[in-house]
C-alpha cells in the first residue's frame, strides 16, 4: 500500500503540514518532484484527506477544554449527534462504543460557561440522558 518513504512523508506532514517539499526531499534523498508525486498519490488514495491548523484555545479565551461523554436514548442517538454538530463550542464529535455513546471535545471560556453548555444546551437536547465532562488538564501528545 505505502512504502517507508511515504510513511516518513506522512510523519513530517503530520507534524507540520506546511513543511516545504524541498525540505522533505532533502530528508529523503529524493527530488522535490518525487515528493510532490508521492503526496499527490497519497491524496488520491484518500490517505491524506486534507490539511489543517492547530489552534490554541487559551489564546482565544477558552480556558477549559473537555472531553465530554453524552448518553442518549438509543432511538435518539443520531438526532442528538446532528444537534451537537450545530454547536460552535463542539470542536470534535465521535460516536463511541465505550462508556458513552457520543464523545465531544468542547471548548468553554470558564467553569460558568461550561455549566451553561452542559445544563442549558447539551442537557436540554431531546433524548440526552447523561452528560459527563472530563476537563483536560494538559495535552501530552
Curated annotation (Swiss-Prot):
GO MF annotation terms: sequence-specific DNA binding
Keyword Transcription: yes
Keyword Repressor: yes
Classification via InterPro entries: ArsR-like_HTH, AsnC-type_HTH_dom, Dimeric_a/b-barrel, HTH-LrpA_regulator, HTH-Siroheme_Decarb, Tscrpt_reg_AsnC-like, Tscrpt_reg_AsnC/Lrp_C, Tscrpt_reg_HTH_AsnC-type_CS
Signal peptide residues on this chain, from the entry's feature table: none
Residue ranges flagged as DNA-binding region: 21-40
Keywords of the record: DNA-binding, Repressor, Transcription, Transcription regulation
CDD domains reported for this sequence: HTH_ARSR
Superkingdom per UniProt: Archaea
Residue ranges of every copy of the HTH asnC-type domain listed in the record: 2-63
Domain remark text: Consists of an N-terminal domain containing a helix-turn-helix (HtH) DNA-binding motif, and a C-terminal domain of mixed alpha/beta character reminiscent of a number of RNA- and DNA-binding domains.
Subunit structure, interactors included: Homooctamer; tetramer of dimers. Forms a homodimer mainly through interactions between the antiparallel beta-sheets of the C-terminal domain, and further interactions lead to octamer formation.
Functional note: DNA-binding protein that negatively regulates its own transcription. Interferes with RNA polymerase (RNAP) recruitment by inhibiting the association of RNAP with the TBP-TFB promoter complex. Binds to a 46-base pair sequence that overlaps the transcriptional start site of its own promoter.
Record's protein name: HTH-type transcriptional regulator LrpA
Source species: Pyrococcus furiosus (strain ATCC 43587 / DSM 3638 / JCM 8422 / Vc1)
Gene symbol of the encoding locus: lrpA
